[in-house]
Amino acid sequence: MELTEKVVILKTGKFKENDLWVRFLSATRGVQNAFAFGGSRSRRRFGGCLEPFSQVLFKTGTNKTGTYQVLQEGSLVKGYPGIRSDFRKMGLAANCFKFIESAVLERDGNRAVFDLLTETLDVIEEADPDDFFPLFFRAKVAFEQGYNPDFTICAQCGKPLFSSRPVVFNIEKGQLNCLDCNDGRQGETISSGTARTLAWIQDTGPASWINLRLPADIRQECFSVMDRFMAYHMGVVWEGNGYRKI
């Protein structure tokens, strides 16, 4: 079966002198792998589009037995030269790519994650986002995948949580409780500023995040609590210089 679809290339590599393997995020099928036979020399079929940090329109098929995908041709949609020429920006984008490669995405959420990734690349290309930017991306991916706590009200009594008092985040249940309803046995106490920040990330996109400047304590608390949240619900944890499935 042949498909024509828009993708973002995550990673490429050689497996023969002129042939490449390509890992990409499809807007409809999630993370995919395919072979581009003659990809390193065929300008007619793949001219300038088989590089990471590229948005590409691919025509794909399969081999005769249907055991693997074959890229038949591609055309560049957007190349992100600003990312490729800046090591810091490249690192921010690569961090987001590594998370996408490691996370198991729900099929129904592929389009939302694809749109989120392309918007994230646009922002990194055009602006100079904070080093914390990939965390916002990871949190938003988790929310788009359905792991979407309500950071605004207590799950027990329904009381709004946006006072100055700390709240309790039950990571396993994906719920927040006010201090009055917390039984003291489950959950992690977080500041109201952290709860407001995570609620804001839920409701906004990458173009809004570039203006966010967080105090150091809220930054660290957001990182700590969302790292554990994604480890529990998505099975992915940051370790060393990459992500590990658990």
Swiss-Prot record:
Identification of the protein by name: DNA repair protein RecO
Residue ranges the record marks as coiled coil: none
Function comment: Involved in DNA repair and RecF pathway recombination.
A Pfam cross-reference name: RecO_N
Top-rank taxon: Bacteria
Species this protein is from: Maridesulfovibrio salexigens (strain ATCC 14822 / DSM 2638 / NCIMB 8403 / VKM B-1763) (Desulfovibrio salexigens)
Keywords per UniProt: DNA damage, DNA recombination, DNA repair
Biological processes annotated in GO: DNA recombination; double-strand break repair
GO cellular component, one term: bacterial nucleoid
The family this protein is said to belong to: Belongs to the RecO family.
Keyword Cell division: no
